[in-house]
């Protein structure tokens, strides 16, 4: 992706300046409102980097911010996708589908990465919870699902393509989109499609 490095630097600046006084989502919205240079696509990609970082809890403490952001993208995505240009061949060849393998890879390549801090409050968990699986779950972003209205499939495909939104067709009427996808202005919500989780679409 052409502007991947720029998005990474912007995310680093935003997170470094954030002091935690307000919820990050509101802080990010205010930041973008004050910086009109960011278009909708810019905001979406920068937001993805930021929220991937926060999914890693306290595990990145002591690591250079831009390197931590790259590691967060690696941990939170099953494949490089649009972020491939940020990584060297060694990381790309070791982009495992299994989250625990990605965690092990980062642990072996970033000295200060501490996977036990993905969820810093392990001591408060019930003894019946599998700690490793629970921590891994924080790195897994559920898809956003839409149900296409009858006869509206061409409209939806065209609208998604025009907006540059990647999707997976689960069926002719069910599409899976990246978590956090903004659908404002993408086709006609309710007329072309509705947002509905996958399990509900099966009933």
Q: Positions of the model-derived regions?
A:
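Conserved SAM-binding loop and adjacent beta-strand
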Residues: 187-202
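Class I Rossmann-like S-adenosyl-L-methionine
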Residues: 1-184, 188
């Amino acid at each position: 992706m052409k502007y991947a490095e720029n998005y990474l630097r912007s995310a680093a600046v935003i997170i470094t300046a954030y002091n935690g006084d307000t919820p990050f989502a509101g802080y990010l919205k205010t930041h973008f409102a004050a910086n009109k240079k960011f278009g909708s696509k810019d905001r979406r990609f920068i937001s993805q980097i930021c929220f991937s970082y926060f999914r890693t809890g306290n595990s990145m403490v002591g690591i250079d911010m831009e390197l931590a952001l790259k590691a967060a993208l690696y941990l939170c995505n099953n494949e490089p996708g649009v972020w491939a240009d940020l990584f060297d061949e060694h990381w790309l060849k070791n982009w495992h589908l299994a989250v625990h393998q990605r965690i092990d890879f980062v642990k072996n390549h970033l000295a200060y990465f501490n996977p036990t801090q993905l969820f810093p409050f392990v001591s408060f968990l019930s003894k019946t919870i599998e700690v490793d699986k629970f921590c891994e779950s924080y790195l897994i972003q559920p898809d956003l699902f839409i149900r296409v209205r009858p006869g509206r499939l061409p409209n939806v495909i065209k609208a998604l393509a025009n907006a540059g939104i990647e999707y997976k067709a689960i069926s002719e009427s069910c599409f899976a989109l990246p978590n956090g996808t903004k659908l404002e202005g993408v086709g006609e919500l309710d007329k072309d499609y509705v947002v509905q989780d996958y399990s509900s679409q099966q009933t």
